[in-house]
């Protein structure tokens, strides 16, 4: 919200409420980690994963369906309720990559530029590894 950053130049939004990182399989409450903005590691891992897949398959146009371990019909929320089974379908790798990074914003963990830079860094790392490590067998 900007209200607790101890910066007098920040105009806080008193109506901002992050979803918070969901507490799973425990009674601990949801939380928003108290760390400053950096390129998102979560977005970086996603950028590396999806860029590796694009490099390997030679296309971004791969549709797939994913079920998170958070919403698998088994995992308990912080008050002991079973979370529903929810599948998410993606039309492309880049759509999943973007949503993966965006999730950190909804949780109140990162800003949009953290997502953008995290994805960019992950892609660069994937390209470096893919182009310099993986070689075809003769």
Which residues does each PLM region occupy?
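Membrane-embedded catalytic cores of phosphoryl/pyrophosphoryl-handling enzymes
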Residues: 1-138
């Amino acid at each position: 919200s900007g209200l607790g950053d101890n910066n007098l130049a920040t105009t806080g939004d008193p109506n901002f409420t992050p979803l918070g990182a969901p507490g799973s399989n425990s009674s601990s409450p949801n939380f928003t980690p108290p760390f400053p903005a950096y390129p998102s590691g979560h977005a970086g891992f996603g950028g590396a994963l999806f860029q590796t897949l694009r490099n390997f398959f030679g296309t971004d146009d791969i549709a797939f369906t994913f079920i998170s371990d958070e919403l698998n019909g088994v995992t308990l929320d912080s008050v002991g309720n079973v979370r529903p089974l929810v599948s998410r379908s993606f039309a492309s790798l880049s759509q999943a990559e973007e949503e993966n990074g965006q999730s950190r914003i909804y949780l109140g963990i990162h800003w949009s530029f953290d997502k953008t830079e995290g994805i960019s860094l992950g892609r660069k790392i994937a390209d470096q590894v893919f182009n310099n490590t993986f070689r075809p067998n003769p």
